[in-house]
A protein has these predicted regions:
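Glycine- and aromatic-enriched membrane alpha-helices
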Residues: 2-494
Length: 494
C-alpha cells in the first residue's frame, strides 16, 4: 500500500531511506510552468487567493444553469490570455493547456496559470449561454453547438484579449472593464440580436398567438437566485485575490442588483398597477449586468446610480426590438447589450483611483470623479467596437452555417414550420419539462381513450400528446372521436 510520507517509526529505526530529495523553491520565470517533482510549486502563492478563485470558479459555473432557468421561465411554454500577444488576439503558446501549470498567470501574478485558465473558461461558457438564448422556440440544437465553439473562438476570445490582456488595444488605451461589460454582455447581447435576424421571426410573430407571457415564474425566480449568487464569483472573483477590492466588488454588485430590481418593478407598476415578480427579476439582472464593468472601480454609493440607470434603460430598451424589427424573444439585447453599454459609460464617470488601489497595487487615472474627463470616451469606443465586431462576425458565422445547412439538413439553423408548431422540445430532444400526457391521464374520466385506442397505440407505439384526442364514453362503441379540449375553471371540458 503506497504512502505519501514515511512514518516516525520508519525514520527512527533507521530502516527507511528517504525516497525523495528536498524540493527547491519554484522559479516563477520557468517557461514550462514548473516541475512538481523537483520544485515546491505551492510556496509561490497564497492559499487564500487560490481558495477564493476556486470558489469563484464554482460560482460562475452556477450561473450557467441559472441562465437556462431564467430564460426557460421567460419563454413561452481561454485561449486569449497568452504571455506574449498582439493587440487583438493571443497566440497558441499554451494550446491544449501546454505548459499551463504553476507559472503566474497573465491576469495576476498571485494565481497560477492553470487556475486562471479554468476560471476564464467559465466566463467563455456563460457568455455563449447568454447568446444562445436567441434560439428560443425556433433554433436547432446541433448547429448552435457548432456555432458556440466557433463564436467563442473568433468573437469572445479577441474581445476578451483586447480588453484584459496587457497587450490589448483597449487595455493600452486605458479602457476600464473589471469583469466583462464588453466581452461578456455587449458581445453576447449583440450576438443574440444577430442570431435573431438570421433565424427570422417565429411563426405567428406580431399576432395574438405570440402575445408574450412567461410560462413559469418559479423558473425565473430560481434562475435569478442562481445568477445573483454566481455573480459574486463573477465580479468579486475578478479581483483574482481575496482582498478589499474583492470585498468592494461584492458590495457594489449586491447594491446594483437590488436597485435595478426595485427600479424595474416601479416602472412596471406605473404602467400596470401590479408588483411584478418577473419585472423585479429582470431588473436584478439588468443591475448586475451594468455593474459588471465597474465593480472593481466604483464606490458603494455609485452602485445605486448603476442600478437605477440600468433598470430604466433596459426596461425601455425592451421596445427596441420592435424598432429594429427583430424577434428577440427573451430581450437579451435589451438587458445585456444595452445594460453593458450603460455600465461601461457609468464606469467612465464614477471610476475612482482609490477603489482600484484597494488591492494594493492597481493604479488608474480614474473617471470623472478624478477629473479624468476623457475616460468616458475610451469607454464609449470600447463599447461601440465590441458591439459592432460581435454583431458583424456573428452574422458572418451564421450565414456560413446557413449555407452549409443547404447541403447538410442536420445543420439547418432553424426548424421548419411544422416542427416549430410541434415544439422544439419534442422535435430536437424528445423530452419535456412538463408531461401533458400524464396530466390528461390524471384528469380524464374513466372510459376516455386517445384516438379511440388504448394508451399504447397500434404496434405498441406511444401516442403523441400533440395528436391526442378523446372519445366520449357513451360513444366508445362507435369509435366517434372528438378533439381534446381544455379543462375550464369549473373542471368541465370545453
Amino acid at each position: 500500500m503506497a504512502r505519501d510520507s514515511p512514518s516516525s517509526a520508519d525514520v527512527s529505526s533507521g530502516d527507511f531511506v528517504l525516497p525523495y530529495v528536498p524540493l527547491i523553491p519554484y522559479n516563477a520565470t520557468n517557461p514550462t510552468g514548473g516541475d512538481s517533482l523537483t520544485q515546491d510549486l505551492n510556496v509561490y502563492y497564497t492559499s487564500g487567493d487560490i481558495a477564493w478563485l476556486l470558489t469563484s470558479t464554482a460560482l460562475v459555473l452556477l450561473m450557467i444553469p441559472g441562465v437556462g432557468l431564467f430564460y426557460s421561465g421567460l419563454a413561452r411554454r481561454n485561449l486569449t490570455f497568452s504571455h506574449t500577444a498582439g493587440p487583438f488576439i493571443g497566440n497558441l503558446e499554451n494550446i491544449g493547456l501546454k505548459d499551463v501549470l504553476a507559472r503566474p498567470s497573465v491576469g495576476s501574478a498571485r494565481v497560477p496559470d492553470l487556475l486562471f485558465a479554468v476560471y476564464q473558461c467559465m466566463f467563455a461558457a456563460i457568455t455563449v449561454a447568454i447568446a444562445l438564448g436567441a434560439l428560443s422556440e425556433r433554433g436547432r440544437l446541433l448547429p448552435s453547438l457548432i456555432f458556440a465553439f466557433i463564436w467563442s473562438t473568433v468573437v469572445y476570445d479577441p474581445i476578451a484579449c483586447w480588453t484584459w490582456n496587457p497587450s490589448g488595444w483597449v487595455y493600452q488605451l486605458g479602457g476600464l472593464d473589471f469583469a466583462g461589460g464588453t466581452p461578456v454582455h455587449i458581445a453576447s447581447g449583440s450576438a443574440a440580436l444577430a442570431y435573431s435576424y438570421v433565424l427570422g421571426k417565429r411563426a405567428g410573430y406580431g399576432t395574438q398567438k405570440l402575445n408574450y407571457r412567461p410560462h413559469n415564474v418559479t423558473h425565473i425566480v430560481l434562475g435569478t437566485v442562481f445568477l445573483w449568487v454566481g455573480w459574486f464569483g463573477f465580479n468579486a472573483g475578478s479581483a483574482l485575490s481575496a482582498n478589499l477590492r474583492a470585498v468592494m466588488a461584492a458590495v457594489v454588485t449586491n447594491l446594483a442588483a437590488c436597485m435595478g430590481g426595485i427600479t424595474w418593478c416601479l416602472i412596471d407598476f406605473r404602467l400596470e398597477r401590479k408588483w411584478s415578480t418577473v419585472g423585479f427579476c429582470s431588473g436584478v439582472i439588468a443591475g448586475l449586468v451594468a455593474i459588471t464593468p465597474g465593480s472593481g472601480y466604483v464606490p458603494a454609493w455609485a452602485a445605486v446610480v448603476f442600478g437605477v440607470c440600468a433598470g430604466v434603460a433596459c426596461n425601455f430598451a425592451t421596445k427596441l426590438k420592435y424598432w429594429l424589427n427583430a424577434d428577440d424573444a427573451l430581450d437579451i439585447f435589451a438587458v445585456h447589450a444595452v445594460g453593458g453599454c450603460v455600465g461601461n459609460l457609468l464606469t467612465g464617470v464614477f471610476a475612482a483611483d482609490y477603489i482600484a488601489h484597494l488591492d494594493g497595487y492597481t493604479q488608474i487615472p480614474g473617471g470623472w470623479l478624478n477629473g479624468n474627463w476623457v475616460q468616458i470616451g475610451y469607454q464609449a469606443a470600447d463599447s461601440a467596437t465590441g458591439m459592432a465586431y460581435s454583431f458583424a462576425v456573428t452574422c458572418i458565422i451564421l450565414i456560413l452555417l446557413s449555407f452549409v445547412g443547404r447541403f447538410i439538413p442536420a445543420l439547418r439553423l432553424r426548424v421548419d414550420r411544422a416542427e416549430e408548431e410541434q415544439g422544439i422540445d419534442d422535435v430536437e430532444i424528445g423530452e419535456f419539462a412538463y408531461d401533458f400526457v400524464e396530466l390528461v391521464r390524471e384528469v380524464r374520466p374513466v372510459g376516455f381513450a386517445d384516438d379511440g385506442e388504448s394508451e399504447i397505440g397500434v404496434g405498441g407505439e406511444d401516442r403523441s400528446h400533440s395528436r391526442a384526442t378523446m372519445v366520449r364514453g357513451s360513444k366508445e362503441a362507435s369509435g366517434e372521436s372528438y378533439p381534446l379540449q381544455a379543462m375550464g375553471r369549473t373542471g368541465a371540458m370545453g
